[in-house]
Amino acid sequence: MKIVVIGTNHAGIATANTLLEQYPGHEIVMIDRNSNMSYLGCGTAIWVGRQIEKPDELFYAKAEDFEAKGVKILTETEVSEIDFANKKVYAKTKSDDEIIEAYDKLVLATGSRPIIPNLPGKDLKGIHFLKLFQEGQAIDAEFAKEKVKRIAVIGAGYIGTEIAEAAKRRGKEVLLFDAENTSLASYYDEEFAKGMDENLAQHGIELHFGELAKEFKANEEGYVSQIVTNKATYDVDLVINCIGFTANSALASDKLATFKNGAIKVDKHQQSSDPDVYAVGDVATIYSNALQDFTYIALASNAVRSGIVAGHNIGGKELESVGVQGSNGISIFGYNMTSTGLSVKAAKKLGLEVSFSDFEDKQKAWFLHENNDSVKIRIVYETKSRRIIGAQLASKSEIIAGNINMFSLAIQEKKTIDELALLDLFFLPHFNSPYNYMTVAALNAK
């Protein structure tokens, strides 16, 4: 069987690796428009902010390793058309050579693309997006310029907040804009997000929330020099757009069933409306256990799992995805936040009737006074069924990072907040208290 994979990042690589390791003997072709593969974009801000010296280790797979296993790798090759009826992929190389690859099974792993705000001046020099490695290189080069002193970041989600930190670490003045009233509004309720807002402000980042960009203006050399919002005009030397991503599904959007944002609709086997076409990662929908329906959640962790599921099903073993919770985390200037499932705001927007329980305590036992940080927790649950549908944690302690995984499993297994209240959680003073803050938050649920 011949399998063509379009896209060589997390989802495409996971699909190919699963096939190679579990179901050998197939002919595999991987195509990507970039010159590299397997770039961990989540590390861009860490590298650009000089928390690591070089970006080399942000790549975890090489073309030659796949080629050694018999895979045909076509990088710097742009797919122009897919003939789904005749099962053919049409592409063109960097040197304009035309390529036609027939397939028995096709895997679309084309990922997501930045949302480009349609504003006057959007094409000016000095306005950047941040997703691909080469975009990270461009921003890194801009940060190295002495004349680039004042940077505007539009969008205070994870990527925007992280690159704002990176710019500050490089000694820049940073203005962080978002139309919402807080940072991280897609993942956390306002009471939690404000903790990050305070952290950002304490580290010298100028916050402009509840502000909407309207226009970019240029200097005499054609570089962006001002950003105009609904409230004021600001002088800037560089703009980084981080307002979000949408599915990169143009190759198939008019032939396959799609979600409201253009993502390719798939079932729990990652199979599209065409039984010989699978879609994985950011280009596809995914089943949310919190929502109990298919939705769109673009995360690298989801991409890897969806690729594994697709690989098994293509290889001949029927395997259903168990669904996801959208578990995520962020660490900015030593302040850590993690969440999973739905926030109260998100749940209400989706029409769910929910309640929540908040609690705050020290991470370790009360008699340990050194390196014992406060932890805030919120558990979100359906009011009637009491099924847990979300959780949020915030602290300077890194221990919270592991705790969110327990809530992820609770959501997946449809556990109630009352069951959580009596869950056997270990106690050791170095790590927690006998009355664990997760236990107390659950016990306090009304």
Swiss-Prot record:
Cofactor section: FAD
- Please name the Pfam families in this protein's record: Pyr_redox_2 (PF07992), Pyr_redox_dim (PF02852)
Query: Active site at which residues?
Result: 10 (proton acceptor), 42 (redox-active)
Amino-acid positions noted as binding NAD(+) in the UniProt annotation, renumbered to this chain: 159, 178, 187, 244, 298, 329
Activity modulation:
Inhibited by hydrogen peroxide, sulfhydryl reagents and quinine, but not by EDTA.
Give GO MF terms, alphabetically: NADH dehydrogenase (ubiquinone) activity
Residues with PTM Cysteine sulfinic acid (-SO2H): 42
Keywords from UniProt, A to Z, are: FAD, Flavoprotein, NAD, Oxidation, Oxidoreductase, Redox-active center
Listed InterPro entries:
FAD-bd_OxRdtase, FAD/NAD-bd_sf, FAD/NAD-binding_dom, FAD/NAD-linked_Rdtase_dimer_sf, Pyr_nucl-diS_OxRdtase_dimer
- Describe cofactor binding as the record notes it: Binds 1 FAD per subunit.
The EC number on file is 1.6.3.4
**UniProt cross-references to SUPFAM superfamilies, sorted A to Z:** FAD/NAD(P)-binding domain, FAD/NAD-linked reductases, dimerisation (C-terminal) domain
Which positions in this protein are listed as binding FAD? 7-11, 32, 42, 79, 109-112, 131, 158, 282, 299-301, 427
* pH relationship of activity: Optimum pH is 6.0-9.0. Below pH 6.0 the enzyme is reversibly inactivated, above pH 10.0 the enzyme is irreversibly inactivated.
Please give the subunit comment from the record.
Homodimer.
Q: What does this protein do?
A: Catalyzes the four-electron reduction of molecular oxygen to water. Active on beta-NADH, but not on alpha-NADH, beta-NADPH or alpha-NADPH. Under aerobic conditions, oxygen acts as the electron acceptor. Under anaerobic conditions, DCIP and MB can replace oxygen as the electron acceptor.
Question: What family is it from?
Answer: Belongs to the class-III pyridine nucleotide-disulfide oxidoreductase family.
Name of the protein described by the UniProt record: NADH oxidase
